[in-house]
């Protein structure tokens, strides 16, 4: 029996390519991390409507079955509310980029970047003036690539409005929206595209 046949058989047995079970398994492994639990609990306990999801590199790595070495999080709370939520649970943090909605929580020397949902008001080719939002699709729309706009809740259920998972699995690095417009918003996206292409293209 050849190796391709065995790989296909293993895929079928363990659902590795047919559904999202392996993704949920990956996020449930992260969930075992005490520090991660503390962050999620702090946000969820702040209000009945507060939501927090994984985003960015850690989601891509789980989908690609790679080791997760850092965790970025997105929340539907404004930065001040994130600070209040962390304070209530005695979690240390610093305002690493609060003008852009980013708070860095620090637990046992482990850093977690927590960023509020945003929408761009205007851009100048490098920086954007933002407003904070509670709309996940709106936040996803301002991101550069489809593979950078995949979110996952603590159980591993994906919010993937631009089919980034499919692009990631197919080795595609696609811009969200009009390429020319997105590059004019931030010219460094050209360099980011090259880096992502080298890392993820097939």
What are these regions (language model features)?
Residues 2-202:
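Catalytic cores of the polymerase beta-like nucleotidyltransferase superfamily
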